[in-house]
Amino acid sequence: MNLSIQEELQPFVEELQRYITPEFLEELAREMKFVKRKRKFSGSDLATICIWISQRVASDPLVRLCSRLHAVTGTVLSPEGLNKRFNEKSVLFLKHVFSLLLQQKICEQTYISNQLLSHFKRIRIMDATMFQVPHTLEHIYPGSGGCAQTAGIKIQLEYDLHSGQFFNFQVGPGKNNDKTFGTECLDTLRPGDLCIRDLGYFSLEDLDQMDQRGTYYISRLKLNTNVYVKNPSPEYFKNGAIKKQSEYIQINVIQILNQLQPGETIEYQQAYIGDKQQLFSRLVFHRLTAAQLQKRLKKIAEKEKSKHRTYSEKSKLVAGLNVYVTNAPWEWVPMEQVHELYTLRWQIEIVFKTWKSLFDIDHCRTVKQERIECHLYGKLIAIFLCSSTMFKMRQLLLQKKKKELSEYKAIGMIQDHLFLLYQSIQNTQEITKLLTRLFHLLQQNGRKSHRYEKKTVFDIMGVIYEYSGCSKQKKAA
């Protein structure tokens, strides 16, 4: 049945508004003892100022925040009174609302059809973003070190590229270890998932666990990891048995780098990785192009400067090589596609870019801890609402118009409509009308730009879609 845009949006809207209506927030505030009796500052007021109307709770003057709150809700508070309301109970309240949103089934309605879905039920991308907070909080949020980073907050995220669902989420100190978070998330894996991990999460033990659970992975390999392949000319005993120590030979990474042309890829299908912890896997070497290498060397130079670290000449030399390990069957992911699939991981960089450039999640002055945390969780709730809406619009635009949505453009436009969403939050019909208008705006102005000979996410995932450019139509195979 061919449903209208409004009919398609109706169940999404009902799920979206479940935990953010004023009535629900008031009831939750009483349950959590945030509000014990009728007061002039309610749970709904806290949500209004932290989620809906204020851009920077942790950096805007309190007088301005009070003024905005009064303009929207009529609530009158002094700056000192508002500052007192940013307390531990406020933080717990907002954190709980965010937790409820993460548990919703909302993303079950945002899957997009693509070729990868026939092999991988979910494409799990994991990464972290970090930002500095006032040094007065270094005992609570110690930073990762480096130039002036005495205090910082790190946010870990794992989400599904098919649907936009947030699987795992953690807010913690900047010094927290990425690899530890990756290991903690293993229990949420399901057979048929594809995990794409970068070097920060590299662990042979974790990859082995994924393999045992029926989960697929594509991971960068640390170049100091010993790698062995079958010896084409092993030594034999007189009885014909292979001498164990000659069955495998160690790979020389520098040698492979010199053999490959820029942009070229080679594969060893049965590689033996590691010494103490052993993993049998496909091993793919991809040499960077000159432009890619230049970009990477620039990043290395920046790290050397900011973290006061010196990279060896060998490290800089092998920086021209990407080495991947994967247990995905060759029939599903040929050698040439391994690097391409890995680049899907960069989508999470776009997600984090919106957090900082559009939502100003990293903007904070030297204010108390609870005010910064209210700002943080208020922003995360707003981000989740905009992100969920974006993934629904992406699915609808593909389904109805066969177009690819630009995630970055769409998030910005949806954020512009956030206050209108707040105004209509109690009325399902009004929200549906608003999102229908938004859909038509995104159809007009939110489509993905296509650069010459550069594949988009839809191209890599094998999504069937169309776009107009240079008087021609294109479909991703």
Swiss-Prot record:
<dbReference type="GO" id="GO:0003677">
    <property type="term" value="F:DNA binding"/>
</dbReference>
<dbReference type="InterPro" id="IPR047952">
    <property type="entry name" value="Transpos_IS4"/>
</dbReference>
<keyword id="KW-0815">Transposition</keyword>
<dbReference type="GO" id="GO:0006313">
    <property type="term" value="P:DNA transposition"/>
</dbReference>
<keyword id="KW-0814">Transposable element</keyword>
<dbReference type="InterPro" id="IPR012337">
    <property type="entry name" value="RNaseH-like_sf"/>
</dbReference>
<comment type="similarity">
    <text>Belongs to the transposase 11 family.</text>
</comment>
<comment type="function">
    <text>Involved in the transposition of the insertion sequence.</text>
</comment>
<dbReference type="GO" id="GO:0004803">
    <property type="term" value="F:transposase activity"/>
</dbReference>
<dbReference type="Pfam" id="PF01609">
    <property type="entry name" value="DDE_Tnp_1"/>
</dbReference>
<protein>
    <recommendedName>
        <fullName>Transposase for insertion sequence element IS231F</fullName>
    </recommendedName>
</protein>
<dbReference type="InterPro" id="IPR002559">
    <property type="entry name" value="Transposase_11"/>
</dbReference>
<keyword id="KW-0233">DNA recombination</keyword>
<keyword id="KW-0238">DNA-binding</keyword>
